[in-house]
């Protein structure tokens, strides 16, 4: 099924078409609810996707949960995709059964999800786990969210690419520019990681900063939330897995010694099935919450 059509209404239509296909595939099996994770802030009480839906702007302001309930006559729940992913790790992952878990997802952007004492942390308006836009450098550059020095600027795919593009315009970044065919706009995170692995100084500086920024956030999470498990996942986590020693060394600089000793940090690159499990986990979680 094509999933990358663009324009007003196309994202909702794609979701509905996919759900139709899944319902046909379910056959006689009972469907108890629908879960959807979207890369945006979601007001879960109202079921409305927020204005910050930069990756799916056609969904901004859409009451998707209500629309799906009406369309399919089933309970339907919509939340941030990394919140859903955290529920999947908590319910289905290798560490299922723990009471507290934090997911940090480094992909194009940087998201996070928090489960404490068996409850998903959303905050008052759905902003409760936006650690990707917590500052790790108070005098850092402006972020696309409107803040400054956010973690996403340093440890997301977009942030790593943009930092490398800036360096590519300097003398020390000549190799970065050459690797991109002379066009800095073609620099992406995989290229930066590859050049850093080959020893290029400019690329190495970008990746060093990414590791330190991620380590600083691990320190914040360990000291502030004291979870049993932190899972680092997402498309960029594949590259961070090879740098695990550097990331953990940075985390050890910022976290209380006894607190970090009690927190297991796992770098586990996800896949599309992880997102599907997240959608299912969200529906199960919300249905169970109704019974409390």
Question: Where do the protein language model's features map onto the residues?
Answer:
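Short beta-strand segments
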Residues: 35-39, 102-109, 113-115
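ATP-binding/phosphotransfer module of carbohydrate and carboxylate kinases, centering on a glycine-rich
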Residues: 1-33, 43-48, 66-74, 88-98, ...
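A charged helix-plus-loop insertion that forms the helical arch/lid used to bind
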Residues: 47-61
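Active-site glycine-centered loops adjacent to acidic/histidine catalytic or metal-binding residues
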Residues: 81, 107, 279
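Short clusters of small/polar residues that mark proteolytic maturation junctions
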Residues: 1-2, 53-54, 125
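Active-site-adjacent loop/helix segments that line or gate small-molecule/cofactor pockets in enzymes
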Residues: 82-86
């Amino acid at each position: 099924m094509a999933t990358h059509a663009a324009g007003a209404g196309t994202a909702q239509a794609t979701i509905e078409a996919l759900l139709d296909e899944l319902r046909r595939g379910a056959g006689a099996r009972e469907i108890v609810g629908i879960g959807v994770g979207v890369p945006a802030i979601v007001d879960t009480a109202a079921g409305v996707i927020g204005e910050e839906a930069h990756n799916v702007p056609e969904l901004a302001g859409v009451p998707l949960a209500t629309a799906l309930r009406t369309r399919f006559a089933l309970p339907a729940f919509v939340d941030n995709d990394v919140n859903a992913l955290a529920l999947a790790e908590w319910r289905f992952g290798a560490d299922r059964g723990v009471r507290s878990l934090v997911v940090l997802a480094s992909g194009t952007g940087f998201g996070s999800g928090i489960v404490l004492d068996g409850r998903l942390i959303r905050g008052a308006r759905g902003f409760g786990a936006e650690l990707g836009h917590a500052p790790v450098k108070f005098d850092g550059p402006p972020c696309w969210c409107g803040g400054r020095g956010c973690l996403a600027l340093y440890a997301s795919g977009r942030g790593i690419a943009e930092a490398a593009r800036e360096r590519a315009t300097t003398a020390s970044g000549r190799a970065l520019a050459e690797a991109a065919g002379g066009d800095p706009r073609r620099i992406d995170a995989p290229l930066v990681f590859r050049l850093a692995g080959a020893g290029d100084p400019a690329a190495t500086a970008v990746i060093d900063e990414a590791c330190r920024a991620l380590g600083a956030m691990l320190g914040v999470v360990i000291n502030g939330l004291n979870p049993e498990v932190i899972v680092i996942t997402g498309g960029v986590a594949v590259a961070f897995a090879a740098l695990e020693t550097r990331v953990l060394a940075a985390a050890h600089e910022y976290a209380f010694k006894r607190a970090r000793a009690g927190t297991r940090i796992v770098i586990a690159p996800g896949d599309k099935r992880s997102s599907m499990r997240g959608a299912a986990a969200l529906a199960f979680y919300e249905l169970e919450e109704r019974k409390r």
